[in-house]
Amino acid sequence: MLLSQTQLLHSSVEIGSISEVRGNAQVLRDKAYGAKLQFDIQQMDDVRTESGRVAITFQDESTVKLTEHSKLVIDEYIYDPDPSKSKMALKFASGTARFITGKFNNKSNISIRTPTADIAIRGTDFTCTVDELGRSLVILLPDENGISSGEILVSTAMGSVTLNKPYQATTVSVYENNPTKPVTLDISLDLIDNMLIVNPPQEVEQQVEETQ
């Protein structure tokens, strides 16, 4: 579906819906709405999970899964059958989220901003955790065959790193610092969704210490 500029400016245009919900969560728009299954998602929505969990599926079949105490704002979303004309821009302020790209596939037109990093995505499955201080932890996940699902460029004001191997990770403490050198984690998918940056994997802690 191609959304015209006029449609995009109209707040009532549906760009996706809540595909999973568990516990308490809200969608902030003109007012606060309780999150429920199949609830329409619109551009500029502010999704907050509180003590619950939510999954959002967009028109291109991309999915964002939010764990407890997460906050996500949908800045911009344009879907076109031609992936090169599509665009997604999100702000992820806190919590843990898993991002799975859909028909956007390998086009580098998906971007996510955290308080400390800018993340450019090319056809991938990854998680991002932002703690209460704004520190960001980004982990690239494998595809169903156990190989790299794509590529992520994590950037700050001082530089950038590329993640392109399964379970590679980087952290960013402040936007004025470089991201840490990528490390490969010894971790399973079962642990990913519940990961908190306040207790990062040992490999990440070691890499942070080496860069200080």
Protein language model annotation of sequence segments:
Residues 47-57, 64-115, 119, 143-152:
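Short, small-residue-rich packing micro-motifs
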Residues 20-22, 49, 121:
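Short, conserved beta-strand element in jelly-roll/cupin
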Residues 9-30:
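Short N-terminal segments immediately surrounding and downstream of signal-peptide cleavage
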Residues 1-11, 33-36, 50, 59, ...:
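C-terminal interaction modules
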Residues 23-24, 52-54, 71, 124-126:
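Generic short beta-strand segments
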Residues 29, 36-37, 67, 76, ...:
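Short linear motifs in exposed loops
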Residues 30-32, 73-78, 121-128, 132:
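Conserved short histidine dyad/triad with adjacent acidic residue
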Residues 29-43, 48-53:
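N-terminal post-signal-peptidase region of extra-cytosolic proteins
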